[in-house]
């Protein structure tokens, strides 16, 4: 006998279902549930008097015979492939199934078996996303890693060796330092990966860094991003299947943007802070986002364009690049990089899917814990200023949300050769997952999982009688300790370094995994929902930006969501 229940009552008990809408934090972004995998009346939920009990929603099936390790029940998945409600089963640290959980002996349509060994995470009324990936990290201090984890980032790729002046400005790690850094990674609950320096005109030193464990190479103007260095670096990358990230020549000393495009020779490359405030050919590096072989990304200090963006950038730049305010040439260098016209255009290029990735540039002009926040602030600003996207098919913002979440999950993973392991909620991938209360979406996660184990969560007083009394703050959980730490996260390296015996030589506890498919197999077209290649023109005097002839301009925001309302200090 069926029982009717109101939508409001159903959502309160089991979370939103097909056709229901959810607001993301305090933004103007609204998502609509596209599909619900449940069977109405057969939902599973944990708790006193609830369904997941012996002989009811819990079966007698052992783990060995198919029961999963963990089920996240009734979660609203937000990913590039869909916005759907489902149970998610985790096993052996990976996503085992997305569908309907329960007891196949008593319930129909079960695709995820709950057994006595199964742990439950209540996803009712929560949003589930893939862990974020930050592909532009300056490893200036190890404390960044905890900050990033608590913001919902589960994979960090970058370079450096601490607060050395080379690392303060660039993400280029030398061969000996790569090995020392990989050894240190056993201490951190985070998937980690290193870039070697790409600035050399002969290949031997670059090959040395790849064999030491670099999974990518970084060309940075502070080390001399000349056409010869660009060509040499890309040639080594093609041979070893590692990605190249580029920060081009702001001063145009060794050539202009056209010369850099010529030196790249149509090969795949990941262009950092492609707008230019973070560095690159002044004033028109932004042109390269129209190249089919260039994967363009932003760093978060220019995300989004606000009334404060220009003012804060000059001082940041002077500190990060070891410049002196008493030297006129240094000031001129800094000022040449900061242009309100190109920053405004960057907002729009993200919204139309011409810029593909957002990362932090941690402590080197960027904020490591604000990748998600700045991404969604940009999306909100663009909706308010530009309205609905043409691709939207319903009374919702589903397409825009899919476009923007791709920028810090699957797209950086594809660009850097990690997407076979991380970047999306798909069966077979690592269970690096983030659970959000919709009111705090993108700002403060409710739980962060690494390899299927809980690594971080807000937690109250450990001496309290329940978990919620103040002081409530983020704390590392069990996956952040002991052997669970090294079994729950991994280090990404080059295949060549594994073939050369890196794991045995270093003796690290974390598993070393190889990146793959970073070269000719990918391009701008591989960037999900963010593959547009418009023809870009920049006026050399006014810095106005046009895409396919259309002027790209917008006003700076005076107020942002996901800001002071969420942060007391």
UniProtKB/Swiss-Prot annotation:
Record EC number: 3.5.1.5
Post-translational modification, as annotated: Carboxylation allows a single lysine to coordinate two nickel ions.
Molecular function, one GO term: nickel cation binding
Sequence ranges assigned to domain Urease in this UniProt record: 131-569
UniProt-annotated binding residues for Ni(2+) 1: 136, 138, 218, 361
Cofactor(s) required, per the database record: Ni cation
One GO CC annotation: cytoplasm
UniProt entry tagged with the keyword Flavoprotein: no
Modified residues (N6-carboxylysine): 218
UniProt-annotated catalytic positions: 321 (proton donor)
Keywords: Cytoplasm, Hydrolase, Metal-binding, Nickel
Binding site for Ni(2+) 2: 218, 247, 273
NCBIfam families per record: PRK13206.1 (NF009685), PRK13207.1 (NF009686), urease_alph (TIGR01792)
HAMAP family the record matches: Urease_alpha
Annotated protein name in UniProt: Urease subunit alpha
